[in-house]
């Protein structure tokens, strides 16, 4: 077992809560949006960013609801950037599977990426700390500029 796998194993209960919260945050009244998101979430990445949030929280205290809100926000922002990046780079395959724009089209992928970004900001608001919202917005700006 690699060190990263050991960390994932140690954080398994927190990661399970995180993934449940991500799915809840992305629930939509729109059937197509839910279909696209369900398909997208089946191809889970390493979740390094939320793992860093969870490890930091454990080091400095505890993993509570506010920490999970922040971890969800970070993961949603990251995924929004990946979805938008796939459109910009016209990438049709990521993690060995079709991207949203590869499976559907660029129009839908941009809207789904925006949906992820909007929900990242809402999760930032849920932390109750305006600095979290500011950080998400700033990171979003930097990601956009970096893509140019």
Predicted segments, located by residue:
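N-terminal amphipathic/basic leader segments beginning at the initiator methionine
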Residues: 1-23
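Mg2+-dependent prenyl diphosphate-binding active-site environment of isoprenoid biosynthetic enzymes
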Residues: 16, 23-148
């Amino acid at each position: 077992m690699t060190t990263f796998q050991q960390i994932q194993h140690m954080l398994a209960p927190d990661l399970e809560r995180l993934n449940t919260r991500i799915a809840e945050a992305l629930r939509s009244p729109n059937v197509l949006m839910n279909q696209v998101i369900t398909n997208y979430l089946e191809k889970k990445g390493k979740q390094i960013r939320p793992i860093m949030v969870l490890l930091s929280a454990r080091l400095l205290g505890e993993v509570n609801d506010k920490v999970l809100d922040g971890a969800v926000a970070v993961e949603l922002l990251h995924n929004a950037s990946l979805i938008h990046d796939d459109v910009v780079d016209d990438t049709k395959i990521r993690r060995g599977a079709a991207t949203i724009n590869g499976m559907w089209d660029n129009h839908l992928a941009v809207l789904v990426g925006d949906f992820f970004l909007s929900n990242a900001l809402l999760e930032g608001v849920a932390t109750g700390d305006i600095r979290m919202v500011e950080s998400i917005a700033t990171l979003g700006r930097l990601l956009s500029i970096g893509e140019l």
